[in-house]
Design a protein with these regions (language model features):
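Core segments of cupin and vicinal oxygen chelate
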Residues: 7-52
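Extreme N-terminal starter segment of soluble prokaryotic enzymes
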Residues: 1-3
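Long, continuous compositionally biased terminal/linker segments
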Residues: 38-81
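A short acidic/small-residue loop/turn micro-motif
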Residues: 101-102, 125-129
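Glycine-rich acetyl-CoA-binding "A-motif" of GNAT/NAT acetyltransferases
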Residues: 119
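Vicinal oxygen chelate
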Residues: 11-14, 70-115
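A short linear hydrophobic-aromatic micro-motif
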Residues: 29-31, 55-57, 93-97
Length: 129
């Protein structure tokens, strides 16, 4: 089981604003922000649900290659809301909401590229309600 994931971004404030909007439909919000004065490192923002930060961004510089992160959605409507919110926040389409039957018959997901080109996915693994 993964406890949390973190990765550097090229523009901390831009990425923080993007994820605050894009992850809200999935029940995520900014849980904690750690500033440089506290650690001696670049600032970091921890997003999560139910008060537990499990999705971290930080630093300045970004990565040489994009990451793929999939976040579980509560239902298909949440996948669609994530996609709309992420696009409105400046994300780029990398796969509109829909069934991805090549994974399994009920794999309903949407993919958005964040401002640094990371492939962020919201996925629901259940049948249509």
């Amino acid at each position: 089981m993964i406890d949390h994931i973190g990765f550097p971004v090229s523009d901390y404030e831009r990425a923080k604003a993007f994820y605050a909007k894009a992850l809200a439909p999935l029940g995520y919000s900014l849980v904690i922000e750690v500033m440089q004065q506290q650690t001696g490192h670049n600032p970091a923002a921890g997003f999560g649900a139910n008060g537990k930060p499990d999705f971290w961004i930080g630093g300045e510089g970004g990565l040489n290659k994009p990451l793929h992160v999939a976040i579980v959605a509560m239902d298909r409507a949440s996948v669609e809301a994530f996609y709309k919110a992420a696009m409105a926040a400046g994300g780029r389409d990398n796969g509109a909401p829909g069934i991805r039957a090549h994974y399994h018959p009920d794999y309903y997901a949407a993919f958005v590229l964040d401002p640094d080109g990371h492939n962020i996915e919201a996925v629901f693994h259940g049948p249509r309600a």
